[in-house]
A protein has these predicted regions:
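Metal-dependent phosphodiesterase/nuclease catalytic metal-binding core
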Residues: 33-38, 158-166
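Hydrophobic/aromatic beta-strand patches that form the interior of the parallel beta-sheet core
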Residues: 19, 41, 78, 103, ...
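Pre-active-site segment of Zn-dependent metallo-hydrolases
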Residues: 24-29, 36-79, 91-100, 104-108, ...
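Metallo-beta-lactamase
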Residues: 2-5, 10-12, 107-158, 164-165
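Histidine-centered catalytic micro-motifs
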Residues: 77-87, 150-155
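A generic local structural motif
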Residues: 5, 60-66, 88-90, 133, ...
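Divalent metal-coordination and catalytic microenvironments
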Residues: 18, 34, 44, 81-82, ...
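N-terminal amphipathic, basic-rich helices that act as targeting or association modules
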Residues: 8-10, 15-24, 28
Length: 166
């Protein structure tokens, strides 16, 4: 049995907790949890491709153990762009997290839908989609307000996110 250390205390009132689930000091598996009060917003759900010394492994997904029992508090998952290191784990993790709303630009959403269908036929029908139609859109996610800004990247419809709290 793996000992992950002591459990984190509840988030104190007025405190923003940021938990990088993956993507820190590694390429891939990008996923960050933002927790404020009773609300959780997730940024990205990517896969990581295996190293040469990992035969038989197709990809590595983020460990979402921290979110167990908190599924009803997830107000949405924001996807920054459509590369697999940012959307690749969505077909596996979204269902495990109760299919929370997903937020992204149109191309990114189309890529997520396609990946869902590749994973399990008909599963894209379960997606609760919020389309960022303009970089000027503002979306309320519980106590969070999500705002967006344009970023240059090698794929269209990439966006940065600003999460505001009260």
């Amino acid at each position: 049995m793996v000992n992950n250390g002591p459990a984190l205390p509840p988030v104190a009132p007025g405190v923003l907790r940021i938990i990088p689930i993956g993507g820190c000091e590694e390429v891939g598996r990008n996923m960050t949890v933002f927790e404020y009060g009773e609300d959780i917003v997730i940024l990205d759900m990517g896969v990581q491709f295996p190293e040469e010394d990992m035969p038989g492994i197709d990809y590595v997904i983020p460990n979402i153990k921290y979110l167990a029992g908190k599924e009803r508090r997830i107000r949405g998952v924001i996807f920054s762009h459509g590369h697999l290191d940012h959307i690749g784990a969505a077909p596996i993790l979204l269902e495990k997290l109760g299919n929370p709303p997903i937020i992204a630009m149109p191309l990114t959403l189309a890529m997520i839908k396609h990946r869902q269908e590749d994973y399990q036929k008909g599963s894209s029908k379960k997606l609760k989609i919020i389309t960022v139609k303009s970089i000027d859109d503002t979306i309320a996610l519980g106590q969070f307000t999500a705002k967006f800004f344009q970023v240059e990247h090698s794929i269209m419809d990439s966006m940065g996110t600003i999460l505001e709290t009260p």
